[in-house]
Amino acid sequence: FRKALAEVLARGGTALIPVFVMGRAQEILVLLGQLKREGAIPMDVPIYTAGSMRAIAEIYDDTRTTTPRVNPDDQVFGVEQHRVPYEAEAKREILDGPGIMVVSSGMMFEPTLANVLARRMVENEEDGVLLVGHPADGTPARRLLDAARADGPGAPVMLADGHGPQPVHCTVERFRFSGHSDRQDLLSIVERLAPEQVLLVHGVH
């Protein structure tokens, strides 16, 4: 992720990071702050966010010392963020890059901001879409990833009804940021709650 992001920014492109608004968005923003402090990406590269993730981020920061955290010193707003503008012309200006867009939805459903921005970036070889969640089958995020992987540069993709197909020239990569509890996490919850009965339910359908 670090390498791919740095490469997009180095060539003057914009990196689109589609995220789920609660949990993954805040995790990515904290990580971006760390990458800036480490010098992995430029300190002055702008980071843009939008929507309810900003309100949720405030709650994360306000409760960082009263809820269990790996590092209570990490703050979502510890890294400077700019609000994605509403105006179409202003959006075009910030896409001139370099920059980082952390917006929802993680699956890039239409008409979310992630979908709107992806349609404006997909034909630009300087830009990159970095997927940090599992793109479910049939979603725009999955269609974009499959097109880029299967057919390479110029492969057609339909990201929204009435728009496209568009040729994929931007970088598209997927990174495995797990949002699930591991075995020890699940066991510790059961041990703390000590319930009389535990029901295990899992399945896509």
What are these regions (language model features)?
Residues 1-205:
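Acidic/His-rich, metal-assisted hydrolase cores and their charged scaffolds
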